[in-house]
Amino acid sequence: MIKGTIINKFRGDVKILEPGLKMLEDIIHIPTLGVVPYLHLDVDDEDSLSERFSRRDKAADIDIAVIRLPRISNFTDFNPLEYIDQVSVRYVAAPGQLGKPDLIILPGTKNTMDDLLWMRQNGLEAAVQKHAAAGKPILGVCGGFQMLGRAIRDPLGVEHGGEISGMGLLPLETEFAGEKTRVRAQGVLDTVGGVLSELSGQPFDGYEIHMGRTGTNRNLVHQENVYGTYLHGLFDRQETTRALVRALMRQKGLDPASVQALDMETYKQRQYDLLADGMRQSLNMDEIYKIVEEGL
């Protein structure tokens, strides 16, 4: 049962809207509990509905290219990187957009096999493999991690069915099972070598949510310059974000001393506090509390 309506993200003078609110109430016989203005907040975007995809690149020392998979998910994993002055984060969907980034990230996806086949067909897989052959680092997260292995099998038809070859950049194979892994994870990253060795021992506070098993108990794996993890929220800890960017700067012969990363937990809480304040100021909270107390 609907007890009230709320107008959200309103731009303009609420007084001009008031006659319309009265008309709405007369038509639907449900009270309007408030008009929330458009609030300039920085909160996590919905998957595939982000303005981040269309942002113009900024000039920066470090260029990070995230593959814009058709079924990309959890891409807010990389938001912390965008707050670092020395870093530009781009989302690319074609080989011609890739350029020569300092790091390629393969993000999570709602369908690993179909998105890998998409990369194979449009040439991005070959471009990523060429990047790896040139000694440049690659990081795969969740579904992107699975793509980097030798093979992906789906005997139960969970995603695509059958078996396809992976990119062959990590010595691992993935098999999808009928049960999804959902787990919170805290700790420090396992020891790795190569360009991103500074990630070794860095703290994380994240989660795993994925289909499939990849035959390793490590939270971070690597072979030469290619790295993979199932962890989402990897860069929410500023120490880990800073370690990644400093490693990339050292690879280019740049001084990493000035790299500062945002404390994402504190930053997010500040944004949600601003959202809560905006809601309280805009809504008839007494009426809302009354509805809550009375129940449906």
Enumerate the predicted regions with their spans:
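C-terminal lobe/tail of nucleotide-utilizing enzymes
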Residues: M1-R90, P95-D102, L169, E173-L296
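Short, flexible coil/turn micro-motifs enriched in small/turn-prone residues
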Residues: L103, G135-L139, G161, Q223, ...
